[in-house]
């Protein structure tokens, strides 16, 4: 516990209003003196409880819920009543509850957002209010916001356009910043940009709570986002802004436009890439190989897949390959087949990853012919197969067996969310590779029984990366998030892998260890920021103290009454 946590907190609120503030409410844990000082006598049951007793009751109530969505709603209700209790409950049951507060359950919560809505959290900034964004940001009661997660809800997980229902994603992401990375909830703010929706189910739903209008696009959309960004810079000039679940056509352009203007990153592109590269590095370390020796096939060439590919290329170059050599080891397969330089329908970021058709002469096929996944596997002979397609079953038995035929121990990463959209299940992959594959998934899966072995499955979850990045940025007061900082995060994650440290187990650490993993990532990120001149230089001792000082624990502090 930090020295700050031991000191009393001076609070100007009292009575029912204090009980209605999730960041300050202790419920039945208010002491006798606090009940007197803050006019709470008679507003709470007589017995004074510890947070341990409150947590035990909350968990017993949680276990009465019948469905995962019910559990999600229950946890969110606690969060909106008492944030300290909410995060204490998560701390004690993180592996069990992480799939409930985030993927995969959060996807259903987004789809049902208007039906299960209970109370306000975060900011809803709609296009008709575009001239009042500064006023909207001023209405936020948190003056010391350090992390904002924003979405326009156009590409929520693998579910597409969810309108304002996408607010569930920033809320869930920021819950993980706190639960996994120790960022105080007082420093976080979820935001949804309501630019309309093209989802007919929402437009025709009488309960839909968002702006009933088709999505704004083009110049109007870009101007609206820029109004928001500039207002954020005025309100919180040192904030870390995370773009979340923007559509492919907007995600990369927004990142490219603003990455040198403020401290920001896109978790779908950069966070996903960092955790994927960390997973690849861990697998290579375990096999005694180099990343630069691998050949990687991607299924899904959207912004996420291409973002991972670019970071893999950057990592290969750090091991000595030149750019052309690294790019020849990357094969991107999308709905048109293998991306090649003779295709006319590729986006800019896809063109950089297209293979030269002239180099594929031995594969067969004429100019313009599609090269399907199986043909790519057969000819490229990859050692790594990564799925970010959102299409269930694309990793067929024939594909996986062909992969294994050329590589005794392939790394297979079906990363699509939610579980219903995964390219193949771990059980299928291990059955088809005689238990030899290394597997990391995007959604959580239970351990798989293969013969007499029970094999844990690593979840290639961005929660391994972004909380540590946030903690490192805040502790070092970094002004930007750079590619070097992301690579430092990936390397730190790889060094925490059980198959690296112990020679057995899953490719990634257990989620129960994620808070310590986040601290290690934070140190690596902060040091890299200092090395690149994006943060003030300090000694290692001062940096470690800053990380510990910024690491929040869900514990109640003593309160003292003060006036406004």
From Swiss-Prot:
The active site is at 102 (proton donor), 173 (proton acceptor). GO terms for molecular function: malate dehydrogenase (decarboxylating) (NAD+) activity; metal ion binding; NAD binding; oxaloacetate decarboxylase activity. Its cofactor is Mg(2+); Mn(2+). PROSITE patterns: MALIC_ENZYMES. Belongs to the malic enzymes family. It catalyses: (S)-malate + NAD(+) = pyruvate + CO2 + NADH; oxaloacetate + H(+) = pyruvate + CO2. It comes from the Bacteria. Divalent metal cations. Prefers magnesium or manganese. NAD(+) binds at residues 155, 268, 417. This is NAD-dependent malic enzyme. One of its GO terms (biological process) is malate metabolic process. Coiled coil: none annotated. A divalent metal cation binds at residues 244-245, 268. The gene is maeA. Keywords: Metal-binding, NAD, Oxidoreductase. Gene3D superfamilies: Malic enzyme, N-terminal domain, NAD(P)-binding Rossmann-like Domain. Homotetramer. GO terms for cellular component: cytosol. The lineage of its organism: Bacteria, Pseudomonadati, Pseudomonadota, Gammaproteobacteria, Pseudomonadales. SMART domains: malic (SM01274), Malic_M (SM00919). It is an enzyme of class 1 (oxidoreductase).
């Amino acid at each position: 516990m930090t020295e700050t946590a031991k000191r009393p907190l001076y609070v100007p609120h009292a009575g029912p209003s204090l009980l209605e503030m999730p960041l300050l409410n202790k419920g039945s844990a208010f002491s006798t003196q606090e009940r007197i000082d803050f006019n709470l006598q008679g507003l709470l049951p007589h017995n004074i409880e510890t947070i341990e007793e409150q947590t035990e009751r909350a968990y017993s109530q949680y276990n009465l819920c019948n469905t995962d969505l019910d559990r999600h709603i229950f946890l969110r209700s606690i969060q909106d009543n008492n944030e300290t209790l909410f995060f204490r409950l998560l701390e004690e049951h993180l592996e069990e509850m992480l799939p409930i507060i985030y993927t995969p359950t959060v996807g259903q919560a987004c789809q049902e957002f208007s039906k299960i809505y209970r109370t306000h959290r975060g900011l809803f900034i709609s296009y008709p209010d575009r001239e009042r964004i500064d006023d909207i940001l001023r209405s936020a009661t948190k003056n010391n916001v350090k992390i904002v997660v924003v979405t326009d809800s156009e590409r929520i997980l693998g579910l597409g356009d969810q309108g304002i229902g996408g607010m569930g994603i920033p809320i869930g992401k920021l819950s993980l910043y706190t639960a996994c990375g120790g960022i105080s909830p007082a420093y976080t703010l979820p935001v949804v940009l309501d630019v309309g929706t093209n989802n007919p189910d929402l437009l025709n739903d009488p309960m839909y709570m968002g702006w009933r209008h088709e999505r704004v696009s083009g110049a109007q959309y870009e101007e609206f986002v820029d109004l928001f960004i500039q207002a954020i810079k005025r309100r919180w000039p040192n904030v870390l802004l995370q773009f979340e679940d923007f559509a492919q056509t907007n995600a990369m352009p927004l990142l490219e436009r603003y990455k040198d203007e403020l401290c920001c990153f896109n978790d779908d592109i950069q966070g996903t890439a960092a955790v994927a590269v960390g997973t690849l590095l861990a697998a290579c370390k375990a096999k005694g190989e180099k990343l630069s020796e691998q050949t990687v096939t991607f299924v899904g060439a959207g912004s996420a897949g291409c973002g991972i590919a670019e970071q893999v290329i950057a990592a290969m170059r750090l091991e000595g390959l030149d750019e052309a050599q690294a790019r020849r080891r990357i094969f991107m397969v999308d709905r048109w087949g293998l991306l090649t330089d003779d295709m006319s329908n590729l986006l800019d970021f896809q063109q950089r990853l297209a293979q030269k058709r002239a180099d594929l002469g031995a594969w067969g096929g004429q100019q313009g012919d599609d090269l399907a996944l199986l043909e790519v596997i057969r000819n490229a002979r990859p050692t790594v197969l990564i799925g970010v397609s959102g299409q269930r079953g694309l990793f067929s038995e024939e594909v996986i067996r062909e992969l294994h035929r050329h590589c005794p121990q392939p790394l297979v990463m079906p990363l699509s969310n939610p579980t219903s959209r995964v390219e193949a299940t771990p059980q299928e992959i291990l059955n088809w590779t005689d238990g030899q594959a290394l597997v990391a998934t995007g959604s959580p899966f239970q351990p798989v029984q293969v013969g007499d072995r029970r094999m844990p499955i690593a979840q290639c979850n961005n929660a391994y990366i972004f909380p540590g990045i946030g903690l490192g940025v805040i502790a070092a007061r970094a002004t930007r998030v750079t590619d070097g900082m992301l690579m430092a995060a990936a390397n730190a994650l790889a060094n925490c892998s059980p198959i690296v440290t112990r020679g057995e187990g899953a490719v990634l650490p257990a989620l129960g260890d994620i808070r310590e993993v986040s601290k290690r990532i934070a140190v690596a990120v902060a040091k890299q920021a200092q090395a690149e001149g994006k943060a003030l230089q300090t000694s290692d001792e001062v940096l470690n103290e800053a990380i510990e000082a910024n690491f929040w624990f869900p514990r109640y502090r003593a309160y003292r009454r003060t006036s406004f």
